[in-house]
Curated annotation (Swiss-Prot):
Binding site for Zn(2+): E184, H247, H264
CC cofactor note: Binds 1 divalent metal cation per subunit. Can use either Co(2+) or Zn(2+).
Protein name: 3-dehydroquinate synthase
Described purpose of this protein according to its UniProt entry: Catalyzes the conversion of 3-deoxy-D-arabino-heptulosonate 7-phosphate (DAHP) to dehydroquinate (DHQ).
HAMAP family: DHQ_synthase
Assigned keywords, A-Z: Amino-acid biosynthesis, Aromatic amino acid biosynthesis, Cobalt, Cytoplasm, Lyase, Metal-binding, NAD, Nucleotide-binding, Zinc
Binding annotation for NAD(+): 71-76, 105-109, 129-130, 142, 151, 169-172
GO molecular function terms noted in the UniProt entry: 3-dehydroquinate synthase activity; metal ion binding; nucleotide binding
Family: Belongs to the sugar phosphate cyclases superfamily. Dehydroquinate synthase family.
GO-annotated biological processes: amino acid biosynthetic process; aromatic amino acid family biosynthetic process; chorismate biosynthetic process
InterPro entries for this protein: Dehydroquinate_synthase (IPR050071), DHQ_synth_AroB (IPR016037), DHQ_synth_fam (IPR030963), DHQS/DOIS_N (IPR030960), DHQS_C (IPR056179)
EC number: 4.2.3.4
Length: 362
């Protein structure tokens, strides 16, 4: 069992990583006998895990209600969020309740925002079931829903009480979802840890085979890196923005193509190549390192170009609504070397458009 602490003073919390955690009531600390819980999950995961977790918690004396939502990025909306509020109010649940997010990034983000908002804030626990959510979205307290004009535009910073990562969940993960998660894994190597990137080059096949030791190390290293960044910059005023490598481009793809048509990791993968090409054009990143990124993404089964039907110009309106924009100026996360990156403003639009167009023709 691996345990990592996200250090935020009185709001610090553990990330527990192991196989078989769903069988142990202690995995869901700080829940205890007599507590009230609302389990939030989706239609895909409910048949796989809902009864198991409900049974484990009820055996420990926890009072469990649940709400099952439709599955998919397009349901990460204010309308579906209201379904959670209605379920909480109908029971009813008070300010001493705990929300448990059982699912991937959509369920985690939406449930976290529900917890941040319901009666001005209640406790919640992240139980991520996809690789992407295990290494990224469940850690750090970013919660949100989408708006038709932009991804994650309505939300809050709100930390969980704990994160429970059961490696066994990956056994039921579709191959496309596994690849999507690997995009965020690869991101950590590009922005923060060149040695980890090299480890990924050497061990990607083991990850694709879901080999336990390799996957446990991979998830632990990603969580360690993110925990360090969040502890230093919880509200994304500086360092934490580096975690958005590829996301400014990727969010444009998701919004333009319709949420869910491209998985988040797929869009981020293409976006990371666009960021690398932009950095190349600025003379601060080598073509050889861009090729290393492309090769690793392709081995993971990820796209390295944007949608053929989306013009370079179509990206700009979305990118100019990005949350990193300051005083109307686009700010991009750009790699400087494998393992080193920066946030840079003032990049001429023609350079960005040229990089996007180059990736469209890849």
């Amino acid at each position: 069992m691996e345990r990592i602490t996200v250090t935020l003073g009185e709001r610090s919390y553990p990330i527990t990583i192991a196989a078989g955690l769903f069988n142990e009531p202690a995995s869901f600390l700080p829940l205890k006998s007599g507590d009230q819980v609302m389990l939030v999950t989706n239609e895909t995961l409910a048949p796989l895990y809902l009864d198991k977790i409900r049974s484990v918690l009820e055996q420990a004396g926890v009072n469990v209600d649940s709400v099952t939502l439709p599955d998919g990025e397009k349901y990460k909306s204010l309308t579906v969020l209201d379904t959670v509020f209605t379920a909480l109010l109908q029971k009813p649940h008070g300010r001493d309740t705990t929300l448990v997010a059982l699912g991937g990034g959509v369920i985690g983000d939406l449930t976290g925002f529900a917890a941040a908002s319901y009666q001005r804030g209640v406790r919640f626990i992240q139980v991520p079931t996809t690789l992407l959510s295990q290494v990224d979205s469940s850690v750090g307290g970013k919660t949100a829903v989408n708006h038709p004009l932009g991804k994650n535009m309505i939300g809050a910073f709100y930390q969980p009480a704990s994160v429970v990562v059961d490696l066994d969940c990956l056994k039921t993960l579709p191959a496309r979802e596994l690849a999507s998660g690997l995009a965020e894994v690869i991101k950590y190597g590009i922005i923060l840890d060149g040695e980890f990137f090299t480890w990924l080059e050497d061990n990607l096949d083991a990850l694709l085979r879901l080999e336990g030791p390799a996957m446990a190390y991979c998830i632990r290293r990603c969580c360690e890196l993110k925990a360090e960044v969040v502890a230093a910059d919880e509200r994304e005023t500086g360092l934490r923005a580096l975690l958005n490598l590829g996301h400014t481009f990727g969010h444009a793809i998701e919004a333009e193509m319709g949420y869910g048509n491209w998985l988040h990791g797929e869009a981020v993968a293409a976006g990371m190549v666009m960021a690398a090409r932009t950095s190349e054009r600025l003379g601060q990143f080598s073509a050889a390192d861009t090729q290393r990124i492309i090769t690793l993404l392709q081995r993971a089964g990820l796209p390295v170009h944007g949608p053929r039907e989306m013009s370079a110009q179509a990206y700009l309106p979305h990118m100019l609504r990005d949350k990193k924009v300051l005083a109307g100026e686009m700010r991009l996360v750009l790699p400087l070397a494998i393992g080193k990156s920066e946030v840079r403003g003032g990049v001429p639009h023609e350079i960005v458009l040229s990089a996007i167009a180059d990736c469209q023709q890849a």
